[in-house]
Amino acid sequence: FTLMNQDSEMIDLASFKGKKVILEWTNHDCPFVKRHYDTDNMQELQREYTDNDVVWLSIISSAEGKQGYVTKSEAKELTTSRNAQPSHVLFDSNGDVGRLYDAKTTPHMYVIDEKGLLRYQGAIDNLGVTGALFSTDLSKAKNYVRNAMNSLFLGEEVAEKNTRPYGC
């Protein structure tokens, strides 16, 4: 896919072949997304992986006039105010890429390896299945994205390839 970023540049996923890529479907109005940003959880993951040459693409699939929609300048402000560090914020306002990836919620996470193969898709963590869905204590959460990335960095198979996403 190719989408426009916050700087009006067209970003092509295929151009990142040879690098690990994390896709994060996001919606700044979603309380589950807010939880991960308000606790600095998402930003810590972004820093950890972008500092290790991983491409992090935050994708907004909200159409103008719909909940979660932001302009390019609002996306830049959100990135700055939250101290977020995605490689790019991408706009999918017609939802085509979201449908292509079957992105159902925000956050909905995807991990792609250097060959361009999807290695993980689903929830960011296990709070959606532990009964702690609304908890703000993420310290005991099993982070599926971190586990998938650790496996890739070790050259191992990702144990949990699919989990049920939760969110908005």
What are these regions (language model features)?
Residues 23-24, 55-60, 88-91, 111:
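Structural recognition of the beta-strand scaffold that forms the well-ordered cores
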Residues 113-168:
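Thiol-/selenol-based redox modules, centered on thioredoxin-like
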